[in-house]
Regions:
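Short coil-to-helix segment of the ABC ATPase nucleotide-binding domain corresponding to the Q-loop/switch region
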Residues: 94-104
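Helix-to-loop junction immediately C-terminal to a conserved catalytic motif
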Residues: 48
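ABC ATPase NBD coupling module
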Residues: 65-83, 113-114
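The feature captures the beta-strand-to-loop junction immediately N-terminal to the Walker
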Residues: 33-35
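ABC ATPase nucleotide-binding domain signature
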Residues: 81-82, 86-90, 95
Length: 127
């Protein structure tokens, strides 16, 4: 389960996220909808620690994290357990589709290349 409590983010006097609360259970698939500029991307960037949060609590895998004071080691550990699809995706143009799919498994998850290729091929067969 993933739970976020009172997530806050401001840029100077502009309060973008004002105490966001959400709970996502294992197996849930969710969509975040809203007009342009409503904070959807900022919310996801804060959840993936691509941008610092001003305040809030994250509960993931029965562990509680203070989003304002989270440590780099905690961030690295959480990133190994989560995924993030960017609004504007970026591919390595000099690599094949399979190489793009397996890159994260090999680099971030330290998976051996053979296993990553097997998983990558299965994923590509689905699209």
């Amino acid at each position: 389960m993933l739970e976020v409590k009172e997530l806050k983010k401001s840029y100077g006097d502009l309060h973008v996220l004002k105490g966001i609360n959400i709970q996502v259970n294992k197996g849930d698939v969710i969509s975040i909808l809203g007009p342009s500029g409503s904070g959807k991307t900022t919310f996801l960037r804060c959840l993936n620690f691509l941008e610092p949060s001003d305040d809030g609590t994250l509960i993931f895998d029965d562990e509680t994290y203070d989003l304002k004071h989270i440590h780099k080691k905690q961030i690295a550990s959480l990133r190994k357990k989560t995924g993030f699809v960017f609004q504007n995706y970026n591919l390595f143009l000099n690599k094949t589709a399979l190489q793009n799919v397996t890159e994260g498994l090999i680099v971030a998850r330290k998976m051996n290349k053979k296993e990553a290729i097997e998983i990558g091929k299965k994923a590509l067969d689905k699209v």
